[in-house]
Amino acid sequence: MKTANDMIPSRMADCPPATLLADLHAAVVERLGAEARALTLERVVLGIFFTGVRLSNGAGGLCATPVKGVPEAVCCPSSAKAMPTPGKIAGRRAVDLLDDLYRTQDLRRALAIATLNALAETLWLRDGPPAGVECLDGDAFDALKIEPGRRVALVGAFPPYMRELRRRGQPFSVLEMDPSTLRPEEMPFYVPAERAPEVVPLADVF
């Protein structure tokens, strides 16, 4: 009988231990079992803002497209490594694309994350939400009860959330790897991502 470790590619060994992607990869593949190995990619779209996949069971997954990875994908010498091979993606087993979770090429990794999200959606649709989890419609940000004066730490520069926090006058910090994604008026809230260990413990909401 195969275990989850048998189905995780060796490339995971080169990945930092206990990362969120590695943990999710292992958990989803193990819980789906044979179903994960039977699912194939039906459609893939690499868009300007989002990369999306649809699996053979109709489940879908998204990932933000890393636009800074596009230049290397359109340069002939590097495009073969940077891009999944067009015309040869549909019909591939979803679990095989998960190898790219551990690659350094941004576009390949984005496609792998979207595929992993589609497999996670498959698990959610099959088994329902975990015990104790309440599912609500609408924007998760609206469901947060953030009291005035409570400090917020945003992991990633999400323009609608930053705009709303600024409108409320809420104190907040934005942990972001790429400061160029922030507008000039948002830069006072920017904190380099590597400072997360000192910023997150000081936040009331993150």
Where do the language-model regions lie?
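Electropositive, gly/pro-rich neighborhoods at or near active sites that engage anionic ligands
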Residues: K2-R167
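Structural motif
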Residues: R151, D204-V205
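Conserved nucleotide-cofactor-binding alpha/beta core module
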Residues: P159-A203
